[in-house]
Design a protein with these regions (language model features):
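C-terminal motif of bacterial Sec signal peptides marking the signal peptidase cleavage site
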Residues: 15-18
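Bacterial signal peptide processing site
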Residues: 20-23
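Basic- and aromatic-lined ligand-binding clefts that recognize polyanionic substrates
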Residues: 37-49, 150-207
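A short, structured surface patch at a secondary-structure boundary
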Residues: 43-92
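Extracytoplasmic ligand-binding site segments that recognize negatively charged/polar headgroups
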Residues: 68, 126-137, 173-197, 214, ...
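Proline-aspartate-enriched helix->loop->beta-strand connector
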Residues: 97-102, 120, 227, 231-235
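Extracytoplasmic substrate-binding proteins
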Residues: 114-183, 268, 279-298
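Structured C-terminal subdomain patch of bacterial secreted/periplasmic proteins
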Residues: 233-298
Length: 298
């Protein structure tokens, strides 16, 4: 009888252990294989981690969306939401019990003590260097340097292929990118998030008006009346997701100004989504590259 009891208890313990192991497997970024349990307080750092195959245990969400960015959401199904980057949910962060917290220097502010009281805190200046530099820095922290180098190598190779496809469509034409919101019309500058992928990675030539924009600002608000002055051969268009922005673009398309644009007449207007194109991260840029490849392969 005692033997049966012992055997029964042993089986129970084994079953519980197996369940525990399964739960650990399903928990994102638990401390295994030397990878710390990470809380990311930047959507861009989160997406850099995803590019390295690491799903953070917790992450902030997009401020406007109040959710993970659409192109990353599926990969973050087991990641705990920690509020928005500008105002993280400290209670959720504390409950997460991370091993390390990744913060964006610009959003974190000067007082890092509240984070350091919870866990070791790593600060990243996302205004310094490129997404490649950010990826490499993160890779050092998580022992994924080889993976980062390979990711960048693959990206650069694909960028060359897409660049060739674009050349066949646009030739030596000059390009600009605009964004339509409910209240504004914006022209993107050479600065991130849009500038680097269009004018550096994909080698497109910006119109003269874009070159003259303030390089410290990501965009400049303009009136639709000055659109013809840019004289673009091709235009990339981002329209905000809300209904008012969508309606604003439909109204713009009906105007004589829009219909008279060189790019419109040449049928070289290319609609692109805000995400992943405006997510200046390793993951965002790669997905934008994939979209460009599909767009210009048609």
């Amino acid at each position: 009888m005692k033997k049966l009891l012992v055997i029964g208890l042993t089986l129970c313990f084994l079953l519980l252990a197996a369940c525990g192991q399964q739960e650990t497997k399903n928990t994102t970024n638990e401390k295994t294989n030397g990878t710390p349990k990470i809380a990311s307080l930047s959507i861009h750092l989160t997406n850099d981690l995803l590019a390295l195959g690491i799903k953070p245990a917790g992450s902030v969400v997009g401020g406007d969306l109040k959710d993970f960015l659409p192109h990353a959401k599926k990969q973050l199904s087991h990641t705990k939401k920690l509020g928005i980057a500008a105002d993280p949910d400290m209670e959720s962060l504390l409950a997460l019990q991370p091993d390390v917290i990744y913060v964006d220097e610009e959003l974190a502010g000067q007082d890092l003590s509240k984070y350091k009281k919870i866990a070791k805190t790593e600060v990243f200046n996302l205004n310094d260097g490129t997404w490649r530099d950010h990826l490499k820095k993160i890779a050092k922290h998580v022992n994924k340097e080889k993976e980062a180098d390979q990711y960048i190598k693959n990206y650069n190779q694909e960028a060359k292929e897409v660049k060739s496809l674009i050349k066949k469509k646009i030739g030596n034409g000059k390009v600009m990118a605009i964004r339509v919101t409910a209240k504004e019309l914006r022209v993107f500058s050479m600065k991130r998030p849009m500038g680097p992928i269009l004018y550096e990675d994909l080698g497109m030539t910006p119109v003269d008006g874009v070159k003259k924009l303030d390089s410290k600002r990501p965009f400049e608000v303009i009136s639709q009346e000055v659109l013809p002055d840019y004289d673009a051969d091709a235009i990339f268009v981002v329209v905000n997701r809300d209904d008012k922005a969508q309606q604003a673009f439909k109204q713009l398309e009906k105007t004589p100004i829009w219909k008279g644009l060189k790019a419109v007449k040449k049928n070289q207007v290319y609609p692109i989504a805000d995400q992943p194109w405006l997510d200046y991260s390793a993951l965002g840029n790669k997905m934008a590259l994939d979209e460009a490849k599909e767009m210009f392969s048609k």
